[in-house]
Amino acid sequence: MAKEKFDRSLPHVNVGTIGHVDHGKTTLTAALTRVCSEVFGSAVVEFDKIDSAPEEKARGITINTAHVEYNSNIRHYAHVDCPGHADYVKNMITGAAQMDGAILVCSAADGPMPQTREHILLSRQVGVPYIVVFLNKADLVDDAELLELVEMEVRDLLSTYDFPGDDTPIIIGSARMALEGKDDNEMGTTAVKKLVETLDAYIPEPVRAIDQPFLMPIEDVFSISGRGTVVTGRIERGIVRVQDPLEIVGLRDTTTTTCTGVEMFRKLLDEGRAGENCGVLLRGTKRDDVERGQVLVKPGSVKPHTKFTAEVYVLSKEEGGRHTPFFKGYRPQFYFRTTDVTGNCELPEGVEMVMPGDNIQMTVTLIKTIAMEDGLRFAIREGGRTVGAGVVAKIIE
């Protein structure tokens, strides 16, 4: 079968299902592909195929994730679904599957459960900006008051973690019904159609990397006689043009400079764009003023910091992580973008030790500044070996 041509005309949005085990995340994922194929002509993906998700490696961590795609009238959605709870934790912390919005699936028959809470907390910690709720298995609940009660509980839970619980859209339905093509009381296909319309309306179109302020992690520094200093790296976001003023942030005091040239594959360009590997020629910057690990940014867009709270996943022994727990006062290296910086870990109140395979919130104090923003990913390393993955939840100073 010929591969379908990827349609670039529709804006692309990344979503995913989250929620407690057996509340119907995978069934809803399959139902979404089915309903969208009938209404909007995208491909159907069967339940079993999603459920036996292939293993992937992200930063050396094994994660099972299923990726499906579907279209609405106005968008192309890429959707991730994970089979196990541990996969969600790893996926969200490593950012292996970035989400512009999440679909929280909660069984109307059971109400919010421990993982419902944990996935909402994780979404808050890793910066998932929007959550839409699908109250599933509503066909099993005869009592309208019970449905209202569950809805209130879910709204309260969202508000607890700083999501707008009162304004969050909640769709009531049955994923299984939709998957079987049924629609009694508009709980099947109609509910899923409504969910897609809600995704369209409630999750704003993400700002593309190229439209964000310029940032390039510096990987290498060269001196070219007669021309000056060139820094190389892959542009993470934005555009850099010749004559743009720039700042060099992190590891030392912030300095300002000007881009006097952009080179790619030994050709001179007027600009470099997000996703491109290039060299940026800097005016008046000496070879020794810059080092790997700093970032080149649009002035004022990113600040250097040393202290932050983070959500961290500690690799298990099987994943090549530590064999033993660590305790408070643990001082590993934190690998941000292109370099390691040593930092001290404070554990939450009442937590004495952290076991391999755990996920935990911690407060980190680095010995040098790093250009950082909420949502920045990092690896935790001991002498070059990755032992954990984390994400900056909140900058303190």
Curated annotation (Swiss-Prot):
Cell compartments where the protein resides: Cytoplasm
Catalyzed reactions: GTP + H2O = GDP + phosphate + H(+)
Protein name: Elongation factor Tu-B
Annotated segments matching region G5: 174-176
Keyword field: Cytoplasm, Elongation factor, GTP-binding, Hydrolase, Magnesium, Metal-binding, Nucleotide-binding, Protein biosynthesis
Coiled-coil stretches: none
Disulfide bond in keyword set: no
